[in-house]
Amino acid sequence: CVSVMHSSRHFQQWNSHPEHWKIWRGYDFGFSKPFSVGWYAADERGRLYRIKELYGCTGTPNEGLRKDPMEQARMIREAEENDPLLKGRVILGVADPAIFDESRGESIADMQEKSPNFLHWMPGDHTRLAGKMQFHYRLAFGEDGRPMLQVFNTCKHFIRTIPNLVYDESNVEDIDTTQEDHIYDECRYVLMENPISAAKHTQPPPMLDDPLDMDPRKDKTRFMRI
């Protein structure tokens, strides 16, 4: 799904960002499976930077920490109070719409909005095909050679999981949801709050190691009409 990612341009790091940039927080709740929180800065051109992540994983892939909603909220608030990129900033939170479900009692969103954590969430747009296309649009290289989504190299779980996602064989319009897709979902909610159109002019991705010479750009064959 996102095999177009290349470390030289998609991944980066810096220590500060302008105060007027918007900060977004995406959230995918999990208990037996990992929960995922990602923080994103949006610049004047609409480019998003994933600047920090909190991933509730035991260290075994796709195994959650089994933290309850209030403990997850405490961890999120602690991260925002201790990170200089986030401390004191107004942060817009968008999350899986499922956390607003009140059919079995108080919703996760309501629990996390209470004292002492005061986390406010908006329900994310869960439209899967449109969200997948936003990933493609964001990761494509524009005329300036840069994608519209860049990821700090400290976001290790994004870098580990996102490039490995594959399509669902029974529904090729979507990814296989049996995979470790929690970061994908959390990021998708933020992308859908900041939609962009497909770039009119894109650059091909840089060539990677190709020991079997499978990249057609290496083909030196030329055909002449005679």
Features from the language model and the residues they span:
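Short, flexible loop/turn elements at secondary-structure junctions
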Residues: 29-31, 97
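Residue-level detector of short, conserved catalytic/binding motifs and their immediate flanks
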Residues: 35, 91, 184
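Extended hydrophobic secondary-structure segments
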Residues: 32-34, 101
